[in-house]
């Protein structure tokens, strides 16, 4: 048979406009679709006619992973779909661990819940941050607590995946208590539920006032660092910001502290003509120059990613 191809595809947080063009193309090209049933339901309108669809329930991760690999070994073009990004608390790592000899494998990134809720809240991930799952289904709870303590001692903005479920109720309060030992009571804490969905809910609070009961299985929680704050946008929205500490900010995010620049004040850019035609050969970019040009840049919605690991 023809050599099979397996794409492990991230669907993003659930809204169609955050499904990447590459992910959409891999889904439309696939002759075999596998995934957790709610994720498969998201893409039914774009699957090619005649494609085989394997939609399974939670708890069958091993079976659907094996089925996706086997279909690719039979020469099929397979899209194995996951919420958010496939490499973040999802199916990319078990797929690669299970073994993919004899097939071509591609991991197609997706907008993960952490990034989706960051955009919803403002810019809480503007500086160094940690991502921790509070589910002890696959990780020992003592190890999770060790990681929470490290994030607390390092003053990292901390995003909690899988913060609470029907049977896991003590984990989030325990984690918040550890963070509260190292951060002021006024530290911003926000919860986003059903991110990028019609029923999206946002609660912005502080470490001192936050109530774990606000959190459900479709939620994610972001706890700020000691420098995080709430600011008000021009359209009078409350936003969560962690300063990047750019030297030109002077330590304040206040419009009256900064000059109103016009284009005449900006340094003159190099006058370079860019061609729409890509170069014939790839160009090596110096890592230091790239880091400078990127200005030192550092994800299953809260409803999609939390289904990954409950």
Region roles according to the model:
Residues 84-157:
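Class I SAM-dependent methyltransferase SAM-binding "motif I" and its flanking Rossmann-like core
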